Amino acid sequence: HNNTIEIPQTVNGGYDFSHLSLKGIVIKDEDLSNSNFAGCRLQNAIFQDCNMYKTNFNFAIMEKILFDNCILDDSNFAQIKMTDGTLNSCSAMHVQFYNAAMNRANIKNTFLDYSNFYMAYMVEVNFYKVIAPYVNLFRADLSFSKLDLINFEHADLSRVNLNKATLQNINLIDSKLFFTRLTNTFLEMVICTGSNMANVNFNNANLSNCHFNCSVLTKAWMFNTRLYRVNFDEANVQGMGITILREEENIPINSDTLITLQKFFEEDCTSHTGMSQTEDNIHAVAMKITADIMQHAD
Protein backbone atom coordinates (compact mmCIF):
# COMPACT_ATOMS: atom_id res chain seq x y z
CA HIS A 1 0.00 0.00 0.00
CA ASN A 2 1.58 3.25 -1.13
CA ASN A 3 1.15 6.18 1.28
CA THR A 4 2.73 8.81 -0.95
CA ILE A 5 0.48 11.57 -2.18
CA GLU A 6 1.13 13.88 -5.08
CA ILE A 7 1.27 17.49 -3.83
CA PRO A 8 0.12 20.01 -6.45
CA GLN A 9 2.32 23.02 -7.15
CA THR A 10 1.43 26.67 -6.56
CA VAL A 11 1.62 29.19 -9.38
CA ASN A 12 4.90 30.51 -7.94
CA GLY A 13 6.57 27.12 -8.05
CA GLY A 14 6.00 26.08 -4.43
CA TYR A 15 3.84 23.24 -3.14
CA ASP A 16 0.16 23.51 -2.26
CA PHE A 17 -0.56 21.91 1.12
CA SER A 18 -3.54 24.17 1.83
CA HIS A 19 -6.27 22.79 4.11
CA LEU A 20 -4.54 19.42 4.52
CA SER A 21 -4.17 17.75 7.91
CA LEU A 22 -0.52 16.76 8.37
CA LYS A 23 0.45 14.78 11.43
CA GLY A 24 3.98 13.76 12.42
CA ILE A 25 5.62 14.97 9.22
CA VAL A 26 9.38 15.57 9.17
CA ILE A 27 10.71 17.65 6.28
CA LYS A 28 14.47 18.22 6.10
CA ASP A 29 16.63 20.20 3.73
CA GLU A 30 13.85 20.97 1.22
CA ASP A 31 13.07 24.03 -0.86
CA LEU A 32 9.51 24.91 0.14
CA SER A 33 9.70 28.56 -0.88
CA ASN A 34 6.42 30.04 -2.16
CA SER A 35 4.50 27.06 -0.76
CA ASN A 36 0.97 27.33 0.56
CA PHE A 37 0.00 25.87 3.95
CA ALA A 38 -3.04 28.15 4.40
CA GLY A 39 -5.69 26.64 6.66
CA CYS A 40 -3.48 23.59 7.15
CA ARG A 41 -3.49 21.57 10.38
CA LEU A 42 0.05 20.62 11.45
CA GLN A 43 0.57 18.37 14.47
CA ASN A 44 3.97 17.19 15.72
CA ALA A 45 5.59 18.57 12.56
CA ILE A 46 9.30 19.25 12.07
CA PHE A 47 10.80 21.52 9.40
CA GLN A 48 14.60 21.41 9.49
CA ASP A 49 17.13 23.27 7.29
CA CYS A 50 14.34 24.23 4.88
CA ASN A 51 14.03 27.23 2.61
CA MET A 52 10.51 28.51 3.34
CA TYR A 53 10.86 31.98 1.88
CA LYS A 54 7.46 33.57 1.13
CA THR A 55 5.53 30.59 2.49
CA ASN A 56 1.87 31.15 3.35
CA PHE A 57 0.61 29.73 6.68
CA ASN A 58 -2.41 32.03 6.94
CA PHE A 59 -5.02 30.61 9.38
CA ALA A 60 -2.98 27.40 9.86
CA ILE A 61 -3.37 25.45 13.11
CA MET A 62 -0.06 24.29 14.57
CA GLU A 63 0.41 22.02 17.56
CA LYS A 64 3.89 21.04 18.72
CA ILE A 65 5.63 22.33 15.60
CA LEU A 66 9.36 22.95 15.18
CA PHE A 67 11.06 25.22 12.64
CA ASP A 68 14.78 24.55 13.02
CA ASN A 69 17.36 26.52 11.04
CA CYS A 70 14.80 27.54 8.41
CA ILE A 71 14.55 30.61 6.20
CA LEU A 72 11.07 32.08 6.78
CA ASP A 73 11.65 35.61 5.47
CA ASP A 74 8.62 37.37 3.92
CA SER A 75 6.32 34.53 5.01
CA ASN A 76 2.75 34.91 6.20
CA PHE A 77 1.88 33.53 9.66
CA ALA A 78 -1.06 35.89 10.13
CA GLN A 79 -3.97 34.57 12.19
CA ILE A 80 -2.34 31.21 12.87
CA LYS A 81 -3.21 29.27 16.01
CA MET A 82 0.03 27.86 17.38
CA THR A 83 0.45 25.90 20.62
CA ASP A 84 3.86 24.81 21.90
CA GLY A 85 5.62 25.86 18.71
CA THR A 86 9.36 26.53 18.40
CA LEU A 87 11.40 28.71 16.06
CA ASN A 88 15.05 27.89 16.60
CA SER A 89 17.94 29.50 14.67
CA CYS A 90 15.59 30.82 11.99
CA SER A 91 15.63 33.89 9.83
CA ALA A 92 12.11 35.30 10.07
CA MET A 93 12.47 38.86 8.78
CA HIS A 94 9.55 40.84 7.35
CA VAL A 95 7.18 38.07 8.47
CA GLN A 96 3.47 38.79 9.10
CA PHE A 97 2.35 37.41 12.49
CA TYR A 98 -0.56 39.83 12.99
CA ASN A 99 -3.51 38.49 14.98
CA ALA A 100 -1.57 35.25 15.51
CA ALA A 101 -2.24 33.22 18.65
CA MET A 102 1.04 31.69 19.80
CA ASN A 103 0.58 30.14 23.22
CA ARG A 104 3.76 29.00 24.96
CA ALA A 105 5.83 29.62 21.84
CA ASN A 106 9.60 29.30 22.04
CA ILE A 107 11.55 31.73 19.85
CA LYS A 108 15.32 31.50 20.18
CA ASN A 109 18.49 32.44 18.27
CA THR A 110 16.23 33.95 15.62
CA PHE A 111 16.17 37.09 13.47
CA LEU A 112 12.81 38.91 13.44
CA ASP A 113 13.85 42.23 11.87
CA TYR A 114 10.86 44.29 10.67
CA SER A 115 8.36 41.50 11.42
CA ASN A 116 4.79 42.40 12.32
CA PHE A 117 3.14 41.00 15.48
CA TYR A 118 0.27 43.53 15.54
CA MET A 119 -2.36 42.35 18.08
CA ALA A 120 -0.67 38.93 18.38
CA TYR A 121 -1.64 36.86 21.42
CA MET A 122 1.63 35.47 22.80
CA VAL A 123 0.99 34.57 26.41
CA GLU A 124 3.76 32.61 28.18
CA VAL A 125 6.04 32.98 25.16
CA ASN A 126 9.78 32.51 25.66
CA PHE A 127 12.02 34.86 23.64
CA TYR A 128 15.73 34.07 24.01
CA LYS A 129 18.63 35.55 22.02
CA VAL A 130 16.51 37.29 19.40
CA ILE A 131 17.52 40.08 17.04
CA ALA A 132 14.36 42.08 16.35
CA PRO A 133 15.05 45.70 15.39
CA TYR A 134 12.09 47.60 13.93
CA VAL A 135 9.71 44.80 14.94
CA ASN A 136 6.07 45.84 15.37
CA LEU A 137 4.41 44.43 18.51
CA PHE A 138 1.70 47.11 18.77
CA ARG A 139 -1.14 45.86 21.03
CA ALA A 140 0.37 42.37 21.34
CA ASP A 141 -0.29 40.39 24.52
CA LEU A 142 2.97 39.11 26.02
CA SER A 143 1.79 38.66 29.58
CA PHE A 144 3.59 36.00 31.65
CA SER A 145 6.28 35.82 28.96
CA LYS A 146 10.05 35.59 29.45
CA LEU A 147 12.38 37.74 27.34
CA ASP A 148 16.15 37.49 27.66
CA LEU A 149 18.94 38.88 25.43
CA ILE A 150 16.81 40.73 22.90
CA ASN A 151 17.69 43.53 20.51
CA PHE A 152 14.49 45.60 20.12
CA GLU A 153 16.12 48.79 18.80
CA HIS A 154 13.62 51.08 17.03
CA ALA A 155 10.85 48.56 17.81
CA ASP A 156 7.22 49.48 18.51
CA LEU A 157 5.97 47.95 21.76
CA SER A 158 3.22 50.51 22.30
CA ARG A 159 0.14 49.27 24.14
CA VAL A 160 1.76 45.86 24.59
CA ASN A 161 0.60 43.90 27.64
CA LEU A 162 3.69 42.68 29.52
CA ASN A 163 1.92 42.07 32.82
CA LYS A 164 3.88 39.60 35.00
CA ALA A 165 6.55 39.20 32.32
CA THR A 166 10.31 38.93 32.94
CA LEU A 167 12.61 41.13 30.85
CA GLN A 168 16.38 40.72 31.15
CA ASN A 169 19.18 42.11 28.99
CA ILE A 170 16.95 44.01 26.58
CA ASN A 171 18.10 46.71 24.19
CA LEU A 172 15.13 49.04 23.59
CA ILE A 173 17.10 52.06 22.40
CA ASP A 174 15.00 54.53 20.35
CA SER A 175 11.89 52.38 20.69
CA LYS A 176 8.23 53.19 21.34
CA LEU A 177 6.54 52.04 24.55
CA PHE A 178 3.70 54.48 25.01
CA PHE A 179 0.77 53.15 27.05
CA THR A 180 2.71 49.88 27.45
CA ARG A 181 1.63 47.80 30.42
CA LEU A 182 4.59 46.61 32.51
CA THR A 183 2.63 45.98 35.70
CA ASN A 184 4.01 43.35 38.11
CA THR A 185 6.91 42.93 35.69
CA PHE A 186 10.51 42.11 36.57
CA LEU A 187 13.03 44.18 34.56
CA GLU A 188 16.78 43.75 34.79
CA MET A 189 19.34 45.44 32.55
CA VAL A 190 16.73 46.98 30.25
CA ILE A 191 18.06 49.89 28.19
CA CYS A 192 15.44 52.37 26.96
CA THR A 193 17.69 55.29 26.01
CA GLY A 194 15.91 57.87 23.87
CA SER A 195 12.63 55.96 23.89
CA ASN A 196 9.07 57.29 23.87
CA MET A 197 7.45 55.85 27.00
CA ALA A 198 4.66 58.33 27.64
CA ASN A 199 1.83 56.91 29.80
CA VAL A 200 3.74 53.65 30.37
CA ASN A 201 2.52 51.71 33.42
CA PHE A 202 5.17 50.25 35.76
CA ASN A 203 2.89 49.76 38.79
CA ASN A 204 4.13 47.03 41.16
CA ALA A 205 7.13 46.39 38.91
CA ASN A 206 10.62 45.52 40.07
CA LEU A 207 13.40 47.35 38.18
CA SER A 208 17.10 46.79 38.52
CA ASN A 209 19.99 48.26 36.48
CA CYS A 210 17.64 49.91 33.99
CA HIS A 211 18.32 52.98 31.87
CA PHE A 212 15.66 55.53 30.89
CA ASN A 213 18.07 58.34 30.12
CA CYS A 214 16.91 60.87 27.49
CA SER A 215 13.55 59.07 27.30
CA VAL A 216 10.06 60.55 27.42
CA LEU A 217 8.25 59.28 30.55
CA THR A 218 5.54 61.93 30.71
CA LYS A 219 2.46 60.82 32.64
CA ALA A 220 4.07 57.45 33.35
CA TRP A 221 2.77 55.40 36.28
CA MET A 222 5.28 53.96 38.72
CA PHE A 223 3.34 53.25 41.90
CA ASN A 224 4.48 50.61 44.44
CA THR A 225 7.60 50.10 42.36
CA ARG A 226 10.95 48.76 43.52
CA LEU A 227 13.85 50.60 41.92
CA TYR A 228 17.47 49.58 42.18
CA ARG A 229 20.11 51.46 40.15
CA VAL A 230 17.73 53.04 37.69
CA ASN A 231 19.00 55.85 35.49
CA PHE A 232 16.58 58.71 34.68
CA ASP A 233 19.30 61.10 33.49
CA GLU A 234 17.87 63.80 31.19
CA ALA A 235 14.55 61.94 30.99
CA ASN A 236 11.31 63.89 30.64
CA VAL A 237 9.33 62.88 33.73
CA GLN A 238 6.66 65.57 33.69
CA GLY A 239 3.40 64.52 35.33
CA MET A 240 4.81 61.14 36.29
CA GLY A 241 3.26 59.45 39.34
CA ILE A 242 5.70 57.50 41.48
CA THR A 243 5.83 55.80 44.87
CA ILE A 244 8.77 53.60 45.77
CA LEU A 245 8.65 50.48 47.88
CA ARG A 246 11.56 49.92 50.25
CA GLU A 247 11.12 46.91 52.46
CA GLU A 248 7.44 47.39 53.34
CA GLU A 249 7.52 51.18 53.27
CA ASN A 250 5.89 53.05 50.40
CA ILE A 251 7.58 56.40 49.69
CA PRO A 252 5.86 58.94 47.44
CA ILE A 253 8.25 60.91 45.25
CA ASN A 254 7.74 64.10 43.33
CA SER A 255 8.78 63.34 39.75
CA ASP A 256 10.61 66.69 39.53
CA THR A 257 13.08 65.51 42.17
CA LEU A 258 13.42 62.04 40.66
CA ILE A 259 16.64 62.75 38.83
CA THR A 260 18.36 64.26 41.86
CA LEU A 261 17.54 61.10 43.81
CA GLN A 262 19.85 58.83 41.81
CA LYS A 263 21.85 57.98 44.91
CA PHE A 264 18.65 56.85 46.60
CA PHE A 265 18.44 53.93 44.14
CA GLU A 266 22.12 53.06 44.49
CA GLU A 267 22.04 51.92 48.11
CA ASP A 268 22.98 48.40 49.17
CA CYS A 269 24.96 47.81 45.98
CA THR A 270 27.47 45.47 47.54
CA SER A 271 25.89 42.35 46.07
CA HIS A 272 25.69 43.84 42.58
CA THR A 273 28.42 44.48 40.06
CA GLY A 274 29.31 48.14 39.83
CA MET A 275 28.43 49.91 36.64
CA SER A 276 28.78 53.63 36.14
CA GLN A 277 25.99 55.19 34.15
CA THR A 278 27.92 57.07 31.53
CA GLU A 279 26.71 57.24 27.94
CA ASP A 280 29.70 55.14 26.80
CA ASN A 281 28.91 52.48 29.34
CA ILE A 282 25.26 52.23 28.37
CA HIS A 283 26.22 51.92 24.72
CA ALA A 284 28.77 49.26 25.67
CA VAL A 285 26.09 47.29 27.52
CA ALA A 286 23.72 47.54 24.53
CA MET A 287 26.51 46.30 22.28
CA LYS A 288 27.30 43.50 24.72
CA ILE A 289 23.66 42.39 24.74
CA THR A 290 23.75 42.25 20.94
CA ALA A 291 27.11 40.45 20.99
CA ASP A 292 25.78 37.88 23.47
CA ILE A 293 22.80 37.24 21.21
CA MET A 294 24.97 36.91 18.11
CA GLN A 295 27.40 34.57 19.83
CA HIS A 296 25.01 31.65 19.39
CA ALA A 297 23.06 32.94 16.42
CA ASP A 298 25.16 31.01 13.94
Q: Language-model features: where?
A:
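Short acidic DE-rich linear segments
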Residues: 296-298
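Tandem repeat scaffolds
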Residues: 2-287, 294
